[in-house]
Design a protein with these regions (language model features):
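Beta-strand segments within the central parallel beta-sheet cores of soluble alpha/beta enzyme folds
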Residues: 1-2, 123-124, 177
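Beta-alpha junction/loop-to-helix N-cap segments that form part of ligand/metal-binding clefts
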Residues: 1-61, 73, 127-136, 159-161
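Extracellular/periplasmic Venus flytrap/periplasmic-binding protein
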Residues: 15, 59-60, 68-171
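Periplasmic-binding protein-like
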Residues: 20-32, 50-54, 95-100, 147-157, ...
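Short, flexible micro-motifs
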Residues: 33, 38, 109, 181-184
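Short, mixed-charge, low-aromatic patches
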Residues: 37-46, 67-70, 171-178
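Venus flytrap/periplasmic-binding-protein-like
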Residues: 59, 170-186
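Short, solvent-exposed loop/beta-turn-alpha elements that line the ligand-binding surface or hinge
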Residues: 64
């Protein structure tokens, strides 16, 4: 077993994949993050090294130029977006906010939700999930200012928790719906 670290970054993942290939691996398991997987595919596919990801869900990976060498064991976010529209509708949402990370995962999921949602979206705001790069209070305020009845979070656990805390502290009484990225082992 040879381990490489993608750092959840496409450039770092490409470097790690090349190091693994140079070490003679016959396959790569990973990466977890969609952007990192995209970077690794750019190196692994031309080298004929198969990759399987357990967590990369970006719809863009469905049509990636992978020479038939990329596989994943989770569905695309295009499918999750359809499920989220069903959940939002069942929760009685009619004017949801969409708060999404501006990475491959969040952008893809947010775009697919918006295109599958049959009603209007009161606000759609992207943010950089890097710690210190976003203002959870400002994101919450955009939901409140938009008169949204619900908020969909295409977030990871840490930034999602900060946004939910900000929504609560600012008095938001609507429904909060999270995508799979909010899941955390803690």
């Amino acid at each position: 077993l040879i381990v490489g670290d993608s750092g959840c970054d496409g450039t770092q993942a490409a470097t790690a994949a090349q190091t693994l290939i140079d070490s003679g691996v016959s396959a790569i398991v990973g990466a977890a993050c969609s952007g990192a997987t995209t970077g690794a595919i750019a190196v692994a596919a031309p080298a004929g090294v198969p990759m399987v990801s357990y967590a990369s869900t970006s719809p863009a990976l469905t049509t990636a130029d992978d020479n038939g060498h990329f596989f994943r064991v989770v569905p695309s976010d295009a499918q999750q977006a359809v499920a989220l529209t069903d959940v939002a509708a069942a929760a009685g949402a009619s004017n949801p906010a969409v708060l999404y990370m501006t990475n491959d995962y969040g952008s893809g999921l947010g775009d697919n939700f918006a295109s599958n949602w049959s009603g209007s979206v009161c606000t759609s705001v992207g943010y950089d999930p890097s710690e210190g790069s976003y203002d959870a209070s400002a994101l919450a305020q955009s939901v409140i200012d938009g008169g949204c009845d619900s908020a969909l979070l295409m977030s990871y656990a840490t930034d999602g928790a900060a946004i939910m805390e900000a929504l609560s502290s600012q008095g938001f009484k609507g429904t909060i719906i999270g995508a799979d990225g909010l899941a955390d082992a803690a």
